[in-house]
C-alpha cells in the first residue's frame, strides 16, 4: 500500500491557507470571525503558517451544545473559525484525494460527488435485481463517533500517511477530546476512514454485492433471510475485534416490499420510492410557513426552501404531494417576489 510523504509543507503554504479560508468561509461571510480574517487576510494567513511551521498550534476549546437531529439529541462540538476551522480545510485540501481513493464506491457520507442522491440512484439500480434483493439487513453502530478508538484511528491514518509532521497535526486534533467530535470538518472523514476496513471486508472477503453505508448506517440486500442474520453476527464480531465498536441492538432483517428500506431520507421498494415521513412533514411545514409569512422572509430563503425539497422529491414517487402543496398560491408568491426583485424564478421553471 502506497504511503504519502512530503505533504506538510503543502498544507502550510500561503496559497493553500488562502484556499482553505475561501472554502471555510462559504455561507459564513457575515460571521464576526470571518469578517476579522477578511479585514486583513495576509496577517492571519501568516499567523496560521507560523503555528503550523513551528508546531505551536494547539486545538482550541470546543463550544459544546445540544442539537435535535432528525428526532435525536446530539452533542455538537464547535471550534473557532480562526485558526481551527481554517486549518481543518488546509489539511483536507491536500489529503482528501488520498483518503477518498481508499473508500469503496458505495459509501456516501459527506464526500464530494457522492452525495445522498448518488446513493439513491445506486440503491434503485440494485433493486432492479429483484431476486437478489428480496431481504434487507439494516443496522447501525452504537454511539459511533464517541466510541471511535484513537489508537485504532491513528493506525488507520498511518497506513496512508507517512509524513511525521502531518501525523503530529492530525494527532493534535484527534486527542483534543474523547472519541471523534460531531461538528468538526475532519470528523466526517475520520468516520469514513474508520469503517473503511469493514467496507472492504464485506465487499471483497464476504462478497456482499449489495452493501451500502452512509456514516454508520448500513444496508445489505440479499435473497436469503438466514444468510443476512448470519452476516449480522459476523459484522458484530468484526466490529468488536477490529474496531472496538458495537452494533446497536435495533438491527432488522425484513422483506423489502413489506416494509421498504428506510435509508438516505427515503423508503425504497422494488417498484417505487417514497420520501421518509419526517422529510415530507418538514416540506409541508415549510410550505405553510411560506404562505403565512412570505412578506417577512428573504426571497432567497423562500426560493431555496421550495427548491431544496424539489431536489428531494424528484427522486421519489410523490407527484401528488408536490402538486398539492406547490399550488397556485405558492407559484404566485414565487412569481411576485421574483418580478419585484428582478431575479429569475426557479419555481416557475420547474412547476410552470
Regions found by a protein language model. Give the residues of each.
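Active-site-proximal segment of RNA-dependent polymerases
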Residues: 2-7, 14, 92-149
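Conserved polymerase palm-domain catalytic core
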Residues: 51, 106, 121-215, 219-235, ...
Amino acid at each position: 500500500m502506497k504511503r504519502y510523504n512530503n505533504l506538510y509543507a503543502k498544507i502550510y503554504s500561503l496559497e493553500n491557507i488562502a484556499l482553505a479560508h475561501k472554502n471555510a468561509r462559504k455561507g459564513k461571510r457575515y460571521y464576526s470571525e470571518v469578517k476579522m480574517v477578511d479585514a486583513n487576510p495576509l496577517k492571519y494567513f501568516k499567523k496560521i503558517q507560523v503555528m503550523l511551521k513551528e508546531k505551536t498550534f494547539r486545538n482550541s476549546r470546543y463550544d459544546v451544545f445540544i442539537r435535535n437531529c432528525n428526532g435525536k439529541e446530539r452533542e455538537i462540538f464547535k471550534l473557532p473559525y480562526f485558526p481551527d476551522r481554517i486549518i481543518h480545510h488546509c489539511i483536507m485540501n491536500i489529503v482528501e484525494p488520498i483518503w477518498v481513493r481508499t473508500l469503496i464506491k458505495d459509501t456516501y457520507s459527506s464526500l464530494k460527488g457522492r452525495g445522498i442522491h448518488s446513493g439513491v440512484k445506486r440503491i434503485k439500480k440494485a433493486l432492479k435485481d429483484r431476486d437478489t434483493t428480496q431481504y434487507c439487513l439494516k443496522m447501525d453502530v452504537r454511539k459511533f463517533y464517541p466510541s471511535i478508538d484513537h489508537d485504532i484511528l491513528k493506525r488507520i491514518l498511518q497506513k496512508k500517511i507517512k509524513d511525521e509532521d502531518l501525523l503530529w497535526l492530525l494527532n493534535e486534533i484527534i486527542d483534543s477530546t474523547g472519541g471523534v467530535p460531531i461538528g468538526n470538518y475532519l470528523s466526517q472523514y475520520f468516520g469514513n476512514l474508520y469503517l473503511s476496513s469493514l467496507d472492504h471486508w464485506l465487499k471483497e472477503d464476504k462478497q456482499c454485492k449489495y452493501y451500502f453505508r452512509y456514516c454508520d448506517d448500513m444496508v445489505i440486500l440479499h435473497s436469503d433471510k438466514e444468510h443476512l442474520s448470519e452476516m449480522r453476527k459476523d459484522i458484530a464480531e468484526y466490529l468488536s475485534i477490529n474496531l472496538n465498536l458495537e452494533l446497536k441492538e435495533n438491527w432488522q432483517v425484513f422483506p423489502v416490499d413489506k416494509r421498504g428500506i428506510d435509508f438516505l431520507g427515503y423508503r425504497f421498494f422494488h417498484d417505487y420510492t417514497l420520501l421518509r415521513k419526517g422529510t415530507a412533514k418538514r416540506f409541508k411545514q415549510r410550505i405553510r410557513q411560506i404562505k403565512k409569512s412570505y412578506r417577512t422572509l428573504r426571497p432567497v430563503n423562500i426560493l431555496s426552501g421550495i427548491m431544496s425539497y424539489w431536489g428531494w422529491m424528484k427522486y421519489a414517487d410523490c407527484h401528488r404531494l408536490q402538486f398539492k402543496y406547490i399550488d397556485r398560491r405558492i407559484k404566485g408568491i414565487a412569481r411576485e417576489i421574483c418580478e419585484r426583485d428582478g431575479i429569475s424564478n426557479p419555481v416557475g421553471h420547474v412547476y410552470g
